[in-house]
Design a protein with these regions (language model features):
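Conserved helicase motor core of SF1/SF2 NTP-dependent helicases
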Residues: 1-81, 85-167
Length: 167
């Protein structure tokens, strides 16, 4: 009998992109929320705020910083680690050892966008170690085509400057 996944867990490291935000006021949740906001935004877009909130309350969806994964064994789950280029080798090892029975993991990241102060990304390291192992796959996306880039730049210019003469 195939077991169903009981929950979806989304996580990412709490690493700032280039600039230091410094002290954040509030409780622990309000301190980590800014790092998790992109995950919340994506879920709101896919599910709608009300449906997302219901799934969160039922425990079907969990969004947590990577640091909260230590010590857990995650069975019957589908786990997504986002921005994995910003994990250290130690964090990546900790994350991968959370894998429990009937669990699938998806790890996303771009090794050209590392924000770590010590630029040894756990993502780049695991690819060298795990490449070629059965049931583990790595997918590399190609950069956007030059034609798309021109389209994007032109669309942005039109959007930005449209209406400037209306003043």
């Amino acid at each position: 009998r195939d077991k169903q996944v009981n929950r979806i867990i989304l996580t990412r490291p709490a690493v700032e992109a280039g600039e230091r935000l410094g002290f954040l006021p509030g409780d622990l949740q309000s301190k980590v929320d800014p790092y998790l906001r992109p995950l919340y935004d994506a879920l709101f877009d896919m599910l709608g705020a009300e449906s997302f909130q219901k799934q969160l309350e039922r425990g079907n969806i969990e969004v947590a910083p990577l640091a909260y994964m230590r010590g857990r064994t995650l069975d019957d789950s589908f786990i997504i680690l986002d921005e994995a280029q910003n994990t250290s080798v130690e964090q990546m090892k900790m994350f991968l050892t959370r894998l429990g029975f009937n669990t699938k993991m998806v790890i996303t990241g771009d090794v050209t966008q590392v924000d770590l102060t010590v630029p040894k990304s756990g993502l780049a390291t695991i690819e060298r170690i795990l490449d070629g192992i059965d049931d583990i796959a790595f997918a590399h996306l190609k950069p956007a085509a030059p034609d798309f880039r021109i389209f994007w730049d032109n669309a942005y210019c039109v959007h930005t400057f449209k209406g400037e003469g209306d003043r």
